[in-house]
Structures are given as structure tokens and as C-alpha cells.
């Protein structure tokens, strides 16, 4: 094999620097193009289509009116739940969707339950505790209406909003 002289080696070095720079630039540009083309697969949205993202949660207006039992079932099918009565998002949800909707509060046999999981709720921690505590009905369910929790019959039909955490 024939060895190259100093001038030829020097010329190759001078030509290889711009070529290397061009290769680096084309690799970066190609990477950006690939990312933009596949961004939905590489960085999926926190919430699925139709769900509204707010403060690490996804909210869906089902556009259906139904009883509490059916509302809980509908949200479970979507791997979600009804909004809790103690969440600070209730007012925001009302301003976004502008409708009365079920919350997961139910009074049955003088016990206050979260109907998403049938666990007891300490209503003294809720903002309108005094109003809730004055309820004498044996059974009552609640909707969020114009800034407050309002008692209603559990079998009545109301709007259903479902909530779930990001990426579930």
C-alpha cells in the first residue's frame, strides 16, 4: 500500500472538518424532523382526546344525564370516577362546563359516603359543612350547583363529569 505524502494528508484534514460539521448538522436536523413527525408517539398527551387537562387531572363531560349509580358505572368504564366533594376544582369545573353535575357524596343511613369507593367521608372538612349537617333525610345524593353542594334524589338524572389522574 502506498503511503500518502504530508500535503495530501493535510488536504484531507482540511476537507474533513467541514464534512464532519455538515454531518453533525444533518444529524441534528434529521433528529428534529423525526421528533416532530412522531411527537404524538414519543410524547403522548397526559389526557386522551375529549378530556380536558387541569392541574394533574383529566376531566370529561360525558354529555349524559343519569342517576348516581349509573354515573359511577359510566365513569368506571372510562377508568375514572365522579368528582369528590372536597376537591378545590369543583368551581373550575363549573366554570368550564357550566352545568350542574354529580359529586361523589351520598348520605345513607346517617352515614356520609364517597360513592366512588363506598368509604366514609368526614363532612366536617367540607366547605359547606353546616348546610350538609342539617340534612335530615335518610338518603340523599349531591350535585355541584352554582358554587355549592345541593341535595337531590339519588335516582334523579343529572349531568355526569368524570375525573382521573394523568396517564391512567
UniProtKB/Swiss-Prot annotation:
Main localisation: virion
Q: Which residues are glycosylated?
A: 133
Q: Which cysteines are joined by disulfide bonds?
A: 75-162, 141-154
Look up the record and report any one GO term of the cellular component aspect. virion membrane
Q: Which Pfam families match?
A: Lectin_C (PF00059)
Looking at the keywords, is Membrane present?
yes
- Respond yes or no to whether keyword Transmembrane helix is given for this record: yes
> Which residues are in the C-type lectin domain?
54-163
Entry's localization field: Virion membrane; Host Golgi apparatus
What topology in the membrane does the UniProt record assign? Single-pass type II membrane protein
Keywords assigned: Disulfide bond, Glycoprotein, Host Golgi apparatus, Membrane, Signal-anchor, Transmembrane, Transmembrane helix, Virion
The UniProt entry, under SUPFAM superfamilies, shows: C-type lectin-like
Q: Where is the chain membrane-spanning?
A: 15-37
**Residues in the Virion surface compartment per record:** 38-168
Gene3D superfamilies, sorted: Mannose-Binding Protein A, subunit A
* Membrane topology (Intravirion): 1-14
The subunit structure is: Interacts with protein OPG161. Interacts with protein OPG164. Interacts with protein OPG190.
Q: Which family does it belong to?
A: Belongs to the orthopoxvirus OPG162 protein family.
Query: What is the documented function of this protein?
Result: Forms a complex with OPG162 and OPG190 to coordinate the incorporation of OPG164 into wrapped enveloped virion (EV) membranes and, subsequently, the production of actin tails. Therefore plays an essential role in efficient cell-to-cell spread of viral particles.
* Name the record gives this protein: Protein OPG162
Q: Which organism is it from?
A: Vaccinia virus (strain Copenhagen) (VACV)
Amino acid at each position: 500500500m502506498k503511503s500518502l505524502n504530508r500535503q495530501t494528508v493535510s488536504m484531507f484534514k482540511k476537507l474533513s472538518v467541514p464534512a464532519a460539521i455538515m454531518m453533525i448538522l444533518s444529524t441534528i436536523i434529521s433528529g428534529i424532523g423525526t421528533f416532530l413527525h412522531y411527537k404524538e408517539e414519543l410524547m403522548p398527551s397526559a389526557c386522551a382526546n375529549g378530556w380536558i387537562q387541569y392541574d394533574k387531572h383529566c376531566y370529561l363531560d360525558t354529555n349524559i344525564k343519569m342517576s348516581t349509580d349509573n354515573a359511577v358505572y359510566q365513569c368506571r368504564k372510562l377508568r375514572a370516577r365522579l368528582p369528590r366533594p372536597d376537591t378545590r376544582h369543583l368551581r373550575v369545573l363549573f366554570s368550564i362546563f357550566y352545568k350542574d353535575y354529580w359529586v361523589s357524596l351520598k348520605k345513607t343511613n346517617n352515614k356520609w359516603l364517597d360513592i366512588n369507593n363506598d368509604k366514609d367521608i368526614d363532612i366536617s372538612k367540607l366547605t359547606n359543612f353546616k348546610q350538609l349537617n342539617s340534612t335530615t333525610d335518610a338518603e340523599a345524593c349531591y350535585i355541584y350547583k352554582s358554587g355549592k353542594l345541593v341535595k337531590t334524589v339519588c335516582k334523579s338524572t343529572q349531568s355526569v363529569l368524570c375525573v382521573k389522574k394523568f396517564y391512567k
